[in-house]
């Protein structure tokens, strides 16, 4: 990965942003394709397969984040790309039965809601953390509600622990 990063950095002028985005999306599609192929064969995805799927979701997030930073697709409402990513990752998590991708969906949702942790927040807590507690509690409440909805729908997927852990971490 470090070698790819150096290659892109040294040759970015020749590669260009659209080629980089296309390469990230193609790599993400390849990762998703392996999970879809496994699911269509009615096989159980291995732990390595789960992490390949997570890699695909992270590559998709990187492509969307880079496109937003480079081209300002959403303008002043730039944070909406996090909400779109949360929805896409949640759809992928439920479709492909992945707790890892669900955790990425919940993280993107928390980012959209404005819950963030930066090292700078430790040095200027009065300004940087203003309102963070309420946003974190709202996020925890949303995760509890999502877990309750999941339980109500009696989904066969074992996602309740993910919702509970995220809710507990954001509430504390």
Predicted feature residues:
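Alpha-helical multi-pass membrane segments and their bilayer interfacial helix-loop junctions
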Residues: 1-172
């Amino acid at each position: 990965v470090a070698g790819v990063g150096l290659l892109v950095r040294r040759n970015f002028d020749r590669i260009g942003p659209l080629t980089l985005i296309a390469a990230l999306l193609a790599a993400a599609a390849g990762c998703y394709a392996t999970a879809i192929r496994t699911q269509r064969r009615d096989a159980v995805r291995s732990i390595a397969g789960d992490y390949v799927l997570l890699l695909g979701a992270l590559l998709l997030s990187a492509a969307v984040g880079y496109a937003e930073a480079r081209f300002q697709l959403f303008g002043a409402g730039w944070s909406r790309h996090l909400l779109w990513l949360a929805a896409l990752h949640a759809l992928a998590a439920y479709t492909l039965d992945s707790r890892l991708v669900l955790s990425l969906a919940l993280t993107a949702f928390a980012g959209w809601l404005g819950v963030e942790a930066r090292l700078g927040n430790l040095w200027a807590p009065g300004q940087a953390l203003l309102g963070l507690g309420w946003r974190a509690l709202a996020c925890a409440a949303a995760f509890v509600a999502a877990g309750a909805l999941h339980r109500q729908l009696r989904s066969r997927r074992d996602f309740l622990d993910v919702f509970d852990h995220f809710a507990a971490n954001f509430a504390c």
